[in-house]
Amino acid sequence: MAATRTASKNTSAISPQSGRISFAKIHEPLEVPNLLDLQVESFNWLVGNEIWQSRVDAALAEGRTDINTKSGLEEIFEEISPIEDYSQTMSLSFRDHRFEDPKHSVDECKDRDTTYAAPLFVTAEFMNNETEEIKSQTVFIGDFPLMTSKGTFIINGTERVVVSQLVRSPGVYFEKTADKTSDKDIFTCKVIPSRGAWLEFAIDKRDTVGVRLDRKRKQNVTVFLKALGWTADRILEEFGTHESIRQTLEKDHGVETQDQALLDIYKKLRPGEPPSRDAAQQLLENYYFNPKRYDLAKVGRYKINKKLGLSLPFDQQVLTVDDIVAAIHFVCALHEGTAILPREGQDDIVVEPDDIDHFGNRRLRTVGELIQNQLRTGLSRMERVVRDRMTTQDIEAITPQTLINIRPVTAAIKEFFGTSQLSQFMDQNNPLAEMTHKRRLSALGPGGLSRDRAGMEVRDVHPSHYGRMCPIETPEGPNIGLIGSLASFARVNAFGFIETPYRKVVDGHVTDEVVYLTADEEDRHVIAQANAKLDDDGHFANDRVLVRQRHGEADEVPSSEVDYMDVSPRQMVSVASALIPFLEHDDASRALMGANMQRQAVPLVRTEAPFVGTGMEYRCAVDVGDVTLAEKAGSVLSVSADLIDIACDDGTYQTYKLEKFRRSNAGTCINQRPLVKVGQRVEVGTPLADGPSTDNGELALGRNMLAAFMPWQGLNYEDAIILSQRIVSDDVLTSIHIEEHEVDARDTKLGAEEITRDIPNVSEDMLANLDENGIVRIGAEVGTGDILVGKVTPKGETELTPEERLLRAIFGEKAREVRDTSLKVPHGEEGTVIGVRIFDTENGDELAPGVNQMVRVYVAQKRKISIGDKLAGRHGNKGVISKILPVEDMPFLPDGTPVDIILNPLGVPSRMNVGQVLEMHLGWIAHSGWDITQAEGDWAERLREVGLIDIPEESRLATPVFDGATEQEITGLLQYGHPTRDGEMLVDTDGKATLFDGRTGEPFPSKVGVGYMYMLKLHHLVDDKIHARSTGPYSMITQQPLGGKAQFGGQRFGEMEVWAMEAYGAAWALQELLTIKSDDVPGRVKVYEAIVKGENIPEPGIPESFKVLVKEMKSLCLNVEVLNSEGQEIDLRGSEEDTRSGLGIDIGRRPGADNAMAD
């Protein structure tokens, strides 16, 4: 199972790619693997392309046997072949699948709302078994969605990700549970296939061995063995040493022969059906021994062989009698308390119950396998169609094409990509969000757990997660622990188990040979930590080494007993967690928030890489594909905003096209900027262009800001943040957001809709920005209610007046009755039109049925930071901006530099995320630089050894997770930082400075911690949340305003608020709120009229909710009458319609909408 490779050393303190200065002390023999391999390699295996084939050939050349030599599609076509008719006179088989080129490129598919797919063809052979005649044909199976180079799929124009699923592996499992009625333990064994019926053995409190077939009624195991053809003597010969089997055999009264046993089993499995020996034999055969009905899969066979000590071939994917016998032996040994089962010439079998949450028993279904399973479903449906057609068609006229109906296959694929819980709309907030989404592991989904039934155990961190699944990064809320993230160095093997790399240790000497181990292999070894001290020869420096042994227990052992050592201190965490500097100083729950909030950071207009990073920034940005890298070495010929031309050394020319202002799935802006100049020399892998949230090829989610930890006038109470006006005016935290607005012109029953500039009852001012076709011009500034696309819809014919009839008789044309259904800017939005796309059936564009024309308008909005926006650091330290102070009012340093941001110091101690304080100090050190030529102490000696002696200002530092800058180094470097031009040190050796109050110029009484912190602007922007309504839509039944910004709803004045009004005795205000401001329908129309005309507000009437209550009571056969003060009955049917039509007022309209009332 284990794969090895020898790695090269990399001991430089300055990264050759990003130029970061690293404080790492531990030599890592292995680079982080490509972070998208989880997705890309799995899909390559499925389609069996050249990349996959070359990897297989290389692995076979190395002599490895743990790899798949068949592609996923090849496996599935072999599995279904041959399809035979019921009389087995003819068969259909498939081989040699191939793809043709996709119809459209990735960009065209996004533009046209189509799926990026390639036509899949397969050679189908029809064989007449009687004449042995073969007809061969190439058959089209359907359009097969392809994965883009970034590991995503384009489905109907949107980018989607298929998430890998964590499921229980097929195999054999032994469990020990306490009996509720007695103090005995009950031992069970479950044989779980990939598909097919379960087989369960159990030893109950009476010490009898029972078996359960396909979760039906329990029966004695000896009956099952007899049904398989065993005699009582043979059972005693094989299992005579087990008392429980002998007891069970004694209880088998009346079941002696195989026939009796089969009938007995059939009665329990199919009660009510007449039993027969053949039917029983067939049923048992289909349950466990028919490859069409039962499949352990290779992984199931591998697990059973491993657990029970068998050596059956991997292609034996149904149960065998050997499996059943070995499982019974094992469960009996477990019941008897036997520790090991000896085997001749091989390792002994350890007898112990299984831990279902162990990663040796949970495997990943990656993209390829998930699609393969879906294809299997589609092909099995197609198989039924083929069989039916074989029986109905003339055998002479049959060709493969006439037998095959591809609809079930294409429907299965479409259903999976469109509606499956595991095919998700890609989180595209920033490159890290994309990366994390592609590396996500979900225990939910079809065949997995459901969040309601998942208990604590399955959600908890398990020792076997080490190096495989991140213990930190998981969502907060109901999915906690069910959704995880793949660890940085982990990979998935051919069986779907997650492997993690270790350095091999031979007699206390740590080699650079890297071995990948699965969780159950790792359990057998003694493993040292990555930070175990080594001498110059690579031997352990200490005689006893801290290690972890079986079940993750820590212990100290002699160095000669160590088998392996971790390759890196960060191998246990995911990419997002590995981006948090000083993670080791943060509390786990805050680190979780920090990892999750980095994914919510919005790409900024001006990006800046962090002063204090972890060294993972470059790999993350490059692997996700947002940074354009040079594919060949050469020199730059020309550079423009959207094209880079390179003359390559091999005499060829390459052009790189850059993305410009494209909308992401999250509504953020994807824009690339060139990094190279004309004439510049580039090597392979040189970053040519930055993408969103990247800076010189490094991930840059936020900005470095000069932070002070101090209270300020109570404005940073409860984590609120005070910001300097400079951040607003210099566009430090400004982002661009792009909204897409779409309208289509359809055929209606009354005629076709039309996109036009000629809109009834609209002033010329409103049409100023529209072109002659009624579509807004690019560059126009638009606000709420402005028309983007003019559209009219035909109205129903109305009764004509005599005058109109006369005009029509003279001019001979129909009066044009249309209503305005134009696309308008929704409420609360504004911006600049940056793009218009027009699709028309006349130009050959494919549109939905009944749609003649579709127009898409892109509106970009520049959002400066404002009060109410949410900011966060990388340590789970989040807050909302409460005040933006003028620069002159901000506290300033002794040299006059005002700070950018004021944070509350009380946000640190109770949250236990001290990493932010260390980041702030190291940020100041990075900003000011240092010179430790004269410094003394071990810390200075170590930094001098790696060449970090005189570092300039504004340097970028890396402090890797669990191997970063120490407290001694930070306090030492604060002492030896470069002074200002005046020769003074602004920040003392304790990291604090004397700050002055910007309003008075007086120094604050205490010194304040000051330094540079990396702050992120999160997607929770106040512009998306703030909302107000004057008039708007009402609910159909209650006639009360709708709720929520999306429905343009009102603010609910709830039960408790009514109590508050009652408490204050504000009777008139309360009456207004409960009637005319809510659901007194005629009243609110009259009030609107009174306000317009400047009259007094009329008396409120009866609210609609009261009428609904009366109706409810009438439905219970209670005749409720409402009387006025004179005792006369009030008619509740009201005159709301009369009032509305009389006044010509409709206050139920939504601004910018054409619907009169919403439900």
Curated annotation (Swiss-Prot):
Pfam families tied to this protein: RNA_pol_Rpb2_1, RNA_pol_Rpb2_2, RNA_pol_Rpb2_3, RNA_pol_Rpb2_45, RNA_pol_Rpb2_6, RNA_pol_Rpb2_7
Enzyme class label: transferase
Reactions accelerated catalytically: RNA(n) + a ribonucleoside 5'-triphosphate = RNA(n+1) + diphosphate
EC number from the UniProt entry: 2.7.7.6
One record GO biological process: DNA-templated transcription
Domain of life: Bacteria
UniProt protein name: DNA-directed RNA polymerase subunit beta
Annotated source species: Cutibacterium acnes (strain DSM 16379 / KPA171202) (Propionibacterium acnes)
Gene it is expressed from: rpoB
